[in-house]
């Protein structure tokens, strides 16, 4: 019995360590991509995979006249539910991270923010220009936003493998750059990949957001008062023509960061509860009894309310986004049915797809690191920003190469940019190949440039 308990505990410990490892999210994403590609291309599973993605979803209510569509009369499929529904939570988490970085993190002051923000800007402009140089005037031109994004899960995951080789300042730089890059990608989606906007629905959504803002200002900290209007705002965005995922980012900006209780109140109240707990009568084998449980619940509630709602939600949602939502998104979108080797000829130009593969591949592999590096170099040389402490130009370029891992956000933009399924599929193949090449290049360069530093 003891041996079984010990093995069970060790299994739980290994599982917890895996979930907490910075590279685990990237590994799960990679597995999801591999499974999706296999299911989409194996003869026995290809049809079933496509049928699964195209299952219609509708929330319905039963009225006097029978069943009627309530929420999704536009014929929402399982795949679009993942893209328009589940990904809202992903963007909500990104919004919380951006807000945290702006308020208390690496983007909280001009001095801290200038280098990663300029690097992110360069890492978006140069890939877009490279893509546009291949596709200007073609049917593939709208895809210029695809190679401008960085997948933070993969980039940070790979960098964490070299924890003893890379200066901590460069890890902070890449994290801040990825957050700024996400903000840029969100703006690109909002400005260039929306549909015709229904101004009435948008106005109603804005009024509700103003109400959420005032809830924040008056100090309301009960999550239900934010959750219900947030769902309404998402629905209004969904029907308004603005991509519904952006509602997650907007709502995140109004979630309060300030805790309900001050440090002094928390310390005083917790001290009183601890004293009351110790004074409560208790036999040696009777802990916790009902009275103890009351005090423990009070202490737990006090500790929870002494952490801002924004931080609590970020901590709560992060594992679900990393290990559930993003893998589902990858599973639903990375499964490209390859019925011809033509799909792998990403440098081939066709009248139907333009040079979409060439633009994406070189935008990620060349444009991203070049843009990040040149913007950083100019910022440091003109004394607008300071070089990350302990970092050299070679290592900064190696880390910049990891910025070419687009994947999640790039695939998301790919699905928005094109209506033609063939162009979307070719774009996904190019994203996977460009991201893989960027990951390999960044890994090799980090290994080469940091090799001498490992000798102690």
Q: Which ranges hold each PLM region?
A:
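Functional cores that coordinate and move charged inorganic groups
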Residues: 159-271
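Structural signature of hydrophobic alpha-helical transmembrane segments
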Residues: 51, 80-91, 139-153, 194-207, ...
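Entry/N-cap segments of selected transmembrane alpha helices
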Residues: 101-128, 198-207, 340-370, 397, ...
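C-terminal ends of transmembrane helices
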Residues: 12-16, 92-108, 156-167, 210-221, ...
């Amino acid at each position: 019995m003891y041996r079984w308990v010990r093995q069970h505990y060790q299994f739980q410990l290994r599982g917890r360590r895996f979930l907490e490892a910075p590279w685990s999210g990237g590994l799960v994403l990679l597995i999801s991509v591999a499974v999706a590609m296999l299911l989409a291309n194996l003869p026995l599973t290809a049809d079933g995979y496509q049928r699964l993605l195209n299952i219609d979803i509708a929330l319905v209510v039963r009225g006097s006249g029978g069943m009627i569509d309530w929420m999704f009369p536009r014929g929402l499929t399982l795949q679009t539910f993942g893209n328009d529904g589940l990904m809202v939570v992903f963007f909500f988490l990104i919004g919380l991270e951006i807000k945290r970085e702006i308020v208390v993190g690496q983007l909280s002051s001009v001095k801290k923010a200038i280098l990663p923000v300029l690097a992110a800007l360069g890492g978006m402009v140069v890939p877009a220009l490279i893509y546009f140089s291949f596709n200007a005037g073609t049917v593939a031109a709208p895809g210029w936003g695809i190679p401008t994004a960085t997948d933070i899960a993969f980039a940070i995951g790979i960098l964490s493998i070299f924890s003893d080789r890379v200066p901590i300042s460069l890890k902070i730089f890449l994290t801040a750059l990825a957050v700024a890059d996400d903000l840029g990608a969100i703006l690109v989606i909002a400005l260039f990949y929306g549909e015709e906007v229904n101004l009435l629905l948008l106005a109603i959504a804005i009024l509700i957001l103003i109400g959420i803002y005032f809830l924040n200002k008056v100090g309301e900290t009960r999550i239900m008062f934010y959750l219900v209007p947030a769902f309404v705002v998402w629905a209004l965005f969904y029907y308004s023509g603005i991509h519904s995922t952006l509602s997650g980012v907007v709502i995140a900006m109004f979630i309060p960061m300030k805790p309900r209780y001050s440090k002094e109140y928390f310390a005083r109240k917790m001290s009183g509860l601890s004293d009351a707990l110790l004074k409560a009568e208790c036999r040696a084998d009777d802990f916790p009894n009902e009275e103890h449980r009351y005090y423990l619940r009070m202490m737990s509630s006090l500790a929870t309310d002494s952490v801002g709602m924004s931080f609590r939600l970020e901590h709560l949602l992060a594992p679900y986004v990393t290990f559930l939502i993003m893998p589902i998104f990858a599973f639903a979108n990375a499964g490209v049915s390859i019925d011809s080797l033509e799909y792998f000829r990403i440098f081939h130009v066709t009248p139907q797809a333009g040079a979409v593969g060439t633009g994406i591949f070189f935008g990620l592999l060349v444009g991203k690191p070049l843009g990040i590096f040149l913007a950083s170099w100019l910022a440091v040389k003109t004394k607008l920003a300071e070089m990350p402490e302990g970092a050299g130009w070679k290592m900064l370029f190696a880390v910049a190469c990891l910025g070419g891992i687009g994947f999640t956000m790039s695939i998301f933009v790919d699905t928005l940019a094109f209506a033609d399924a063939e162009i979307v599929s070719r774009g996904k193949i190019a994203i996977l190949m460009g991201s893989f090449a960027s990951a390999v290049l960044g890994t090799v360069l980090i290994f080469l440039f940091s090799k001498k530093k490992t000798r102690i």
